C-alpha cells in the first residue's frame, strides 16, 4: 500500500475514534493543531510571534547601543573561508536584530583565495557601524577568537560561529535577562540560552536543544551550554580568553574556567541561536 495512503487512513481512523471517545470539539482542536504543525513548521514553538518582534523594534526605534538601556554584548566570530551564502545569512541575522545593543567582532583568517570574505563584510559595514573587522593570520580557532576579542567594546561577550544564525531577538532577550538578574540581586556574569538546528531555513528548525538550568556535573561531562553563551568581558580578561592548546574543545574549556569564577550560569529558556 502507498505509504501516504496508509498514513491518511490511519489518521482518519484516529479522528473517528477520538470523536467517539472525547467528542467532536476535541477532535477538531487536535486536528487544527496537527495541520498547523504540518503546514507552518515549528516556528511558533521556537521564535516569538511577529507582533512580539515588532514591539521590540518599536521599543528600540531611534535608539543606539549607548542609550537603549541594555548592556552592550560583543559577539566574537572568527572567519575562515566562509561560503558567501552562510556569511550573508549570519551577517543578516546580526543586522536585523530587534535591539541595537550588539557589536559584531570579526577576525578574518581566510586565505588569499577567499578575498571575497573581506569584501562582503565591508559591504555590510556600510549598513551597520556596529560591525568591526580585522584581517589576521590563521593561528587556530582559539587564537582567532582571542583576536576577535581584541576588537570588543562591550561589557559582555558572546561566541558565534561564522556559519550560524542569531535569532532576531537574541541581543534584546539577553540584554533584558541581564537587567532582570541585576534587579533580583542574582549573579549576572554568565548566561546561556537554548538553540535550534536547521538545514535550509530558520523558520523551519529540525530540532531544538532545550537545555537544563545550570547543571555542573553535566557540564563536566559535555559542553551542553554551547550557544548562545554570554559572559562578562571582565571575566574573559581575568582568565585570559581561550587557550590554543584546547583547540577543538576550546569553548568547553572556557566555560569550565568561567564557572570557577561565577559559581554557575543563568539559563535563559528561549531559542536565541
Indicate where each model-derived feature is located:
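N-proximal low-complexity "stem/linker" segments adjacent to membrane-targeting elements
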Residues: 21-93
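Short, acidic, metal-binding catalytic loop of nucleotide-sugar glycosyltransferases
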Residues: 92-101
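Conserved donor NDP-sugar-binding/catalytic core segment of glycosyltransferases
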Residues: 169-205
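Conserved nucleotide-sugar donor-binding catalytic segment
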Residues: 216-273
Amino acid at each position: 500500500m502507498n505509504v501516504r495512503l496508509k498514513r491518511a487512513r490511519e489518521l482518519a481512523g484516529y479522528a473517528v475514534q477520538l470523536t467517539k471517545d472525547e467528542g467532536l470539539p476535541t477532535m477538531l482542536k487536535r486536528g487544527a493543531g496537527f495541520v498547523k504543525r504540518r503546514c507552518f513548521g515549528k516556528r511558533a514553538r521556537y521564535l516569538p510571534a511577529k507582533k512580539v518582534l515588532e514591539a521590540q523594534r518599536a521599543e528600540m526605534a531611534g535608539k543606539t547601543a549607548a542609550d537603549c538601556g541594555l548592556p552592550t554584548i560583543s559577539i566574537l566570530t572568527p572567519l575562515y573561508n566562509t561560503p558567501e551564502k552562510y556569511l550573508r545569512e549570519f551577517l543578516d541575522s546580526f543586522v536585523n536584530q530587534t535591539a541595537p545593543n550588539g557589536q559584531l567582532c570579526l577576525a578574518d583568517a581566510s586565505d588569499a583565495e577567499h578575498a571575497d570574505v573581506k569584501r562582503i563584510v565591508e559591504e555590510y559595514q556600510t549598513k551597520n557601524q556596529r560591525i568591526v573587522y580585522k584581517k589576521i593570520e590563521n593561528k587556530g580557532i582559539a587564537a582567532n577568537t582571542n583576536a576577535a576579542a581584541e576588537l570588543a567594546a562591550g561589557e559582555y561577550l558572546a561566541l558565534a560561529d561564522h556559519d550560524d544564525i542569531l535569532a532576531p531577538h537574541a541581543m534584546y532577550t539577553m540584554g533584558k535577562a541581564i537587567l532582570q538578574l541585576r534587579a533580583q540581586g542574582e549573579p549576572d556574569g554568565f548566561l546561556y540560552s537554548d538553540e535550534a538546528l536547521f538545514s535550509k531555513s530558520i523558520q523551519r528548525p529540525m530540532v531544538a536543544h532545550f537545555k537544563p538550568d545550570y547543571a555542573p556535573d553535566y557540564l563536566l561531562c559535555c559542553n551542553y551550554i554551547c550557544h548562545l553563551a554570554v559572559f562578562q568581558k571582565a571575566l574573559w580578561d581575568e582568565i585570559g580568553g581561550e587557550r590554543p592548546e584546547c583547540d577543538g574543545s576550546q569553548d568547553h574549556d572556557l566555560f569550565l574556567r568561567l564557572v570557577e569564577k561565577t559559581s554557575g550560569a543563568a539559563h535563559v529558556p528561549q531559542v536565541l541561536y
